[in-house]
Every structure is written in structure tokens, then in C-alpha cells.
């Protein structure tokens, strides 16, 4: 079977790939070895990846809301993750 391209992979796989690439870009930028042009290019790419991840998360939240109450998804309460403070 042929390998799937990025556009044919699942939203979860694309999200994970985007997040991994974003983390790698952040690490490169934090080291500080990039030129100004490279930093700007990395920043621009990072913003695009961030927006892709954010959109995927918003779509996932909508799916959860639709599954929770298909008749009235707008009334579903927003998911609040548990606090890690203890």
C-alpha cells in the first residue's frame, strides 16, 4: 500500500506532526544560533503551525460538544482540564 501524504493523514496525525515540528522550531530559536533571516523564517513557520494546531483543537472541541449534546452543542460546557497545581 502506498504511503499517505501529509494531506491524506488523519487530523490527529497532522496535529502531532505540526506540534512536533513546532517544538523543534522553538528549540532551534531558543539556542540562538539562527541568523535573523532564519529566525524570521522559523517564526513565520511556527505561527502557521500554531494556527493549524489551534484549528485542529477547536474542531476537536466542536466534535466533543456535538457528541455531548447533538441537539444543542452551543449549550455544552467548555472542557476545563484538571489543575496541575495539586
UniProtKB/Swiss-Prot annotation:
> What are the recorded GO MF terms, alphabetically?
exodeoxyribonuclease VII activity
**Which principal EC class is assigned to this enzyme?**
hydrolase
**Record field: catalytic activity:** Exonucleolytic cleavage in either 5'- to 3'- or 3'- to 5'-direction to yield nucleoside 5'-phosphates
Q: Where in the cell is it found?
A: Cytoplasm
Which residues fall in a coiled-coil region?
none
State the Gene3D superfamilies in the record.
Exonuclease VII, small subunit (1.10.287.1040)
**Family, similarity comment:** Belongs to the XseB family.
Q: Which NCBIfam families does the UniProt record give?
A: PRK00977.1-4, xseB
Indicate what this protein is called per its UniProt record.
Answer: Exodeoxyribonuclease 7 small subunit
Amino acid at each position: 500500500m502506498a504511503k499517505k501524504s501529509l494531506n491524506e493523514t488523519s487530523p490527529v496525525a497532522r496535529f502531532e506532526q505540526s506540534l512536533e515540528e513546532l517544538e523543534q522550531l522553538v528549540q532551534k530559536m531558543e539556542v540562538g544560533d539562527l541568523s535573523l533571516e532564519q529566525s524570521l523564517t522559523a517564526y513565520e513557520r511556527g505561527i502557521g503551525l500554531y494556527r493549524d494546531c489551534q484549528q485542529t483543537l477547536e474542531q476537536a472541541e466542536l466534535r466533543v460538544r456535538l457528541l455531548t449534546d447533538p441537539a444543542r452543542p452551543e449549550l455544552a460546557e467548555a472542557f476545563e482540564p484538571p489543575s496541575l497545581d495539586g
